[in-house]
């Protein structure tokens, strides 16, 4: 669990995202002890219950924003609180989501559109 000070910093940051109208979703992830993995092997799906061996690279949460440019996303990302706590080494990863328009027209894409899937416009 993150310390109270970090939770406060994260709350402030996410409030700023919401006030700017760019926050779509955000949440922390519980320990892998409460999760599972599914491995695909040929036609089989093999379920492994957590906990999993801790790795150096751990996804502990996510924040999804919708902005107009890479530069705007980078500016927000640089303001993200250090997830390990100030003065400690840490790293966050920023990636762009696919939008349905990134795919060519198809019946499958239309089915996702009908679900209302994808970022809000």
Regions found by a protein language model. Give the residues of each.
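Conserved, structured core segments of small domains
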Residues: 1-121
């Amino acid at each position: 669990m993150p310390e109270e000070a970090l939770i406060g910093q994260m709350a402030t940051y996410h409030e700023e995202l919401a006030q700017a109208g760019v926050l779509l979703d955000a949440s922390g992830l519980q320990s892998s002890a409460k999760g599972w993995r599914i491995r695909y092997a040929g036609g089989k799906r093999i379920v492994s219950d957590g906990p999993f061996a801790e790795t150096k690279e751990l996804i502990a949460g996510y924040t999804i924003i919708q902005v107009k440019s890479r530069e705007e996303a980078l500016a927000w990302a640089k303001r993200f609180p250090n997830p390990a706590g100030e003065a400690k080494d840490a790293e966050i990863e920023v990636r762009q989501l696919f939008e349905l328009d990134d795919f060519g027209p198809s019946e499958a894409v239309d089915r996702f559109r009908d679900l209302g899937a994808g970022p809000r416009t």
